[in-house]
């Protein structure tokens, strides 16, 4: 058996998770957000988001997706962003809405982006403003109807 030395750094966190305990990733994360509400969840560019912040912001994003945009279960939403704190908020909001997140490399060329958006059938994209020029080149060749920056 191979030694798993990294487990020493887990502290009180279990090394194994009973996957049958949760009905979804959202349920798992909602429990963590309640348990650790006041603790830092993410740090990015000098700002810290607590688990409570992530809970609140992702719930608001989910509501926006469902009520304002009409996103339904199974819809595919592209996310073209570096690893900023907005990324996990978008992920959880999309998951809470029952949609599917399609991760898009922010370094894609226009041809690569066009292919991925069309292949996945995305009509909505959450995009880092630094990547919008690439999207602007090909948006007319895709089904994208909504751009969220």
Label the model's feature ranges.
Residues 96, 100-149:
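Structural core segment of the AMP-binding/adenylate-forming
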Residues 31, 63, 92, 115, ...:
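Surface-exposed charge patches
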Residues 47-49, 64-111, 129:
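Conserved AMP-binding/adenylate-forming
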Residues 27-28, 53, 60, 86, ...:
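Well-ordered alpha-helical segments embedded in enzymatic catalytic cores
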Residues 59-63, 82, 118-121:
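Solvent-exposed alpha-helix faces
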Residues 1-49, 53-68, 73:
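N-lobe entry segment of adenylate-forming
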